[in-house]
C-alpha cells in the first residue's frame, strides 16, 4: 500500500470519526441552546444587563423548578456585543451552530442594527430572530419574513398607539389638527424606523410633525432642546435608548419644557431612564408592554428558586422587578413557550431552529395560559400566525411619580386597518428586491386544518 493511499485512508477514517463524534454529541445532548448576543458594557448597558438578566433568570427557573421543558434542559452562552453591529454579527456566526451538541433555538440580540444585519443570514440558516418590541416593522408579515418575529409590538404599532392616546387627550383624533408634535429620535436605524408612519399620521390628522435626531450615544442634547423650546410643540415623542433618555429629561427641564408632555417610547420607559434625572423626572410619561413590580407568581418563583439559591444573574439585586428585567422575563416566557409548542408537534427533544420557528408561529398564549405561567398581567395575550409575527400590538401608558411607575391607561391598541396595508406593501417591496416568493398563508392554514 502506497503512502498516498495510507494517507487517504487515514483522512477518510478521521472524517468518519469526526462525523460519528458530532452525531454522538447531538444524540447525547438533551439540551436546547440559546445564544445570547448580550451587551453589559457601554452606553446601553442598563438595557442589556437588565433584559438579559431577566431572560437568563427565567431559563434558570425552568431548569431548576421544572427540570427544563419536558425534560430538555435549557443552556446558553453570552457573547458581548457592546451594541455594536459588527460584533453582533461576529457573535451570531460564532454561536449559531449550537453548543456541545445542543441545537440553537433562536437569537434575541435586542438590537435593531444587529437584527437588520442578520436577517438574511438567519433566514438562510433557518434560525428564528426574535426582536421583541422592536425591529423591522414589515417583518410582521411572516409570508415574506418566515424567521423574523417582532413579538408583542412593532415600531409602527407603537407610534399608532401614541397618536391614538394623544388624540384622546386632545378631545379626539380630529382635534389633532393644527397641533405641533416633535419626535426626538436616536440617530440609528432604530430611531429612524418610525419617521414614515409619523409623516403619514401627520398628513391624515393635520398635525405638524418635526423630526429631530440625536447622534449616538445621546449625552449632548442642548441644541436639540433649544430648538424644541423655540418651536413650542404640544407634545414630544422621545424615541431614545440608553444614556440618551435621562439626558433628554434633564435637558428638557433646563430649557423649560414640561416633562409631562414628553412621551417616552418603549425603549425610553425604564427606571434607569428616569432615576438619573432626579426630581425633574417626576411627571414623565412613557408606554410599556408590561409593568414593573414583583407581585407576579412567576417573579416570586424566580426569587424562590433562582435568586435565593444564589443563581440570579443581576449584579444589582435592586433591579429585580424593574421594567428592563421584567421584559427579559417576558421574552423568556415567549421563547420557552415557542419551544414547548414545537415539542408538542415534533417531540419532547432538542429541536432545530426550523422546528422552533414553527413553535413561534403557532404561539397562542391566552389569559388562561398566562395564569398557569404566573404571568397574568405581566404581558398581554399573544397569538401569532403565518401572516402575523407580532401578535400583540397593544401598550399601556405609565407616569413616573418620582419613585415608581404608575399605570395611567388601559390597553391602547393600534389601528391595524391603517397599518396592515403599509406593512404588506413594504414586505412585498422587500420580497421583490430579494427575489423572495411569499408564502401562501391562507393555503398553509387550510392545509394545517385539513390534516
What residues fall within each predicted segment?
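Short, low-complexity disordered leader/linker segments with a strong preference
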Residues: 1-33, 429-451
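Segments of small-molecule ligand-sensing domains
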Residues: 312-325, 336-410, 451
Amino acid at each position: 500500500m502506497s503512502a498516498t493511499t495510507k494517507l487517504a485512508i487515514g483522512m477518510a477514517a478521521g472524517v468518519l470519526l469526526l462525523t460519528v463524534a458530532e452525531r454522538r454529541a447531538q444524540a447525547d445532548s438533551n439540551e436546547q441552546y440559546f445564544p445570547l448576543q448580550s451587551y453589559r458594557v457601554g452606553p446601553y448597558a442598563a438595557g442589556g444587563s437588565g433584559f438579559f438578566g431577566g431572560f437568563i433568570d427565567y431559563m434558570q427557573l425552568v431548569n431548576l423548578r421544572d427540570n427544563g421543558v419536558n425534560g430538555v434542559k435549557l443552556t446558553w452562552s453570552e457573547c458581548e456585543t457592546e451594541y455594536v453591529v459588527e460584533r453582533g454579527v461576529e457573535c451570531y456566526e460564532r454561536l449559531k451552530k449550537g453548543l456541545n451538541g445542543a441545537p440553537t433555538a433562536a437569537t434575541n440580540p435586542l438590537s435593531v442594527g444587529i437584527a437588520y444585519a442578520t436577517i438574511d443570514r438567519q433566514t438562510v440558516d433557518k434560525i428564528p430572530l426574535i426582536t421583541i418590541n422592536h425591529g423591522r416593522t414589515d417583518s410582521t408579515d411572516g409570508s415574506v419574513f418566515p424567521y423574523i418575529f417582532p413579538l408583542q409590538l412593532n415600531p409602527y404599532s407603537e407610534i399608532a398607539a401614541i397618536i391614538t392616546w394623544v388624540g384622546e387627550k386632545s378631545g379626539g383624533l380630529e382635534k389633532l389638527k393644527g397641533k405641533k408634535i416633535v419626535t426626538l429620535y436616536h440617530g440609528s436605524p432604530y430611531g429612524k424606523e418610525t419617521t414614515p408612519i409619523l409623516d403619514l399620521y401627520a398628513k391624515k390628522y393635520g398635525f405638524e410633525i418635526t423630526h429631530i435626531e440625536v447622534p449616538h450615544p445621546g449625552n449632548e442634547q442642548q441644541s436639540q432642546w433649544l430648538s424644541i423650546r423655540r418651536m413650542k410643540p404640544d407634545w414630544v415623542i422621545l424615541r431614545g435608548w440608553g444614556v440618551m433618555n435621562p439626558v433628554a429629561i434633564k435637558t428638557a427641564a433646563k430649557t423649560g419644557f414640561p416633562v409631562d408632555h414628553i412621551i417616552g417610547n418603549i425603549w425610553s420607559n425604564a427606571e434607569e431612564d428616569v432615576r438619573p434625572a432626579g426630581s425633574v423626572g417626576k411627571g414623565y410619561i412613557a408606554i410599556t408592554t408590561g409593568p414593573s413590580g414583583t407581585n407576579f407568581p412567576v417573579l416570586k418563583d424566580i426569587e424562590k428558586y433562582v435568586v435565593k439559591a444564589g443563581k440570579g444573574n443581576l449584579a444589582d439585586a435592586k433591579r429585580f422587578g424593574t421594567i428592563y428585567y421584567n421584559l427579559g422575563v417576558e421574552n423568556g416566557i415567549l421563547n420557552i413557550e415557542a419551544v414547548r409548542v414545537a415539542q408538542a408537534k415534533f417531540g419532547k427533544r432538542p429541536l432545530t431552529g426550523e422546528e422552533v420557528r414553527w413553535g413561534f408561529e403557532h404561539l397562542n398564549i391566552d389569559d388562561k395560559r398566562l395564569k398557569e405561567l404566573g404571568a397574568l398581567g405581566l404581558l398581554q395575550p399573544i397569538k401569532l400566525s403565518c401572516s402575523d409575527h407580532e401578535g400583540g400590538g397593544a401598550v399601556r401608558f405609565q407616569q413616573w411619580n418620582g419613585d415608581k411607575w404608575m399605570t395611567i391607561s388601559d390597553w391602547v391598541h393600534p389601528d391595524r386597518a391603517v397599518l396592515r396595508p403599509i406593512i404588506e406593501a413594504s414586505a412585498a417591496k422587500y420580497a421583490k428586491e430579494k427575489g423572495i416568493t411569499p408564502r401562501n398563508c391562507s393555503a398553509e392554514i387550510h392545509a394545517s386544518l385539513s390534516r
